Amino acid sequence: MGFAREMRREPTPGEKALWAVLRAAQTGARFRRQEPIGGFVVDFVCLPRRLVVEVDGERHDNARRKEADRHRDEVLSGLGFTVLRFAEWDARCDPIEVADEIWSHLPGNRRVPSVYEFAQE
């Protein structure tokens, strides 16, 4: 639990930007961040919809880390979660587009544009 709390206090720029959009959006889907699940701490999760969202920085680009991520995804899938992965760069530079992709994986979810999006225009 301490590690998850620490991660919530120090999000990456991409996690911070995406969290702002997910919190501001009126979708009816409630996300938690840095949540312990299955022995891992996931970046974001919508528990009722069984959806995990991971924001991967450059350290995820090497073969060893990719294999660890694959294993992690298999464990989470085995627990009934769908896992979506996005690059840190994409989450930081275009969090609204990333959020749109996330919402497309939430069947029956009606998305209403947020104040955050209108402020970006």
Label for each model-derived stretch:
Residues 1-29, 78, 107-121:
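Solvent-exposed, charged helical/coil patches
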Residues 7-11, 17, 33, 38-107:
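Basic, amphipathic alpha-helical patches used to engage nucleic acids or provide basic targeting signals
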